[in-house]
Amino acid sequence: MQIDAASSDERYQIRKLDVTDKNKGFMELLQQLTVCDSVSDEEFQKRFEELRSCGDDHVICVIEDLVLSKIVATGSVFIEKKFIRNCGKVGHVEDVVVDSSARGLQLGKKVIGFLVDHARMTGCYKVILDCSADNKAFYEKCGFKEKEIQMVKYFI
């Protein structure tokens, strides 16, 4: 599908996640990122309310294609409160994905910009993320630098 660049800003709306976004393909979009089991409407509603109760400490950004009424990009940032750096805060970017049909439209950069701006406005002294080697160049274009090594231990 070809998108007219002139109408792109009118076609795509960037905003915070809404509970109705489950019906606009939000969960299917996450399946393009990682293993994502089926979530009932009730489970989605409960998790949505739980995250919303965190206020500015956990924000999920989405981009909706207004023509298709479909969520085509998403990402989240959660704020870690620390004792170091004068009780500073760190933003952790997670779960960034752009629908395969909408890649190349700079939507990923818009999601990252939204999340980084949110972290900055809430007083974070830095924003960090983990990514695959395949996505390193994208994040460098968004102003991130490689630093140190990620480690993980799975429980499931």
Model-derived segments and their meaning:
Residues 62, 70-79, 97:
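Conserved beta-strand in the GNAT
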Residues 119-131:
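Conserved GNAT acetyl-CoA-binding A-motif
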Residues 20, 27-41:
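Helix-loop element at the rim of GNAT/NAT acetyltransferase active sites that forms part
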Residues 49-62, 92, 150:
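A short helix-loop-beta-strand connector motif used in the catalytic cores of GNAT acetyltransferases and
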Residues 128-137, 152-156:
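Conserved beta-strand-loop-alpha-helix junction that forms the acyl-donor binding cleft
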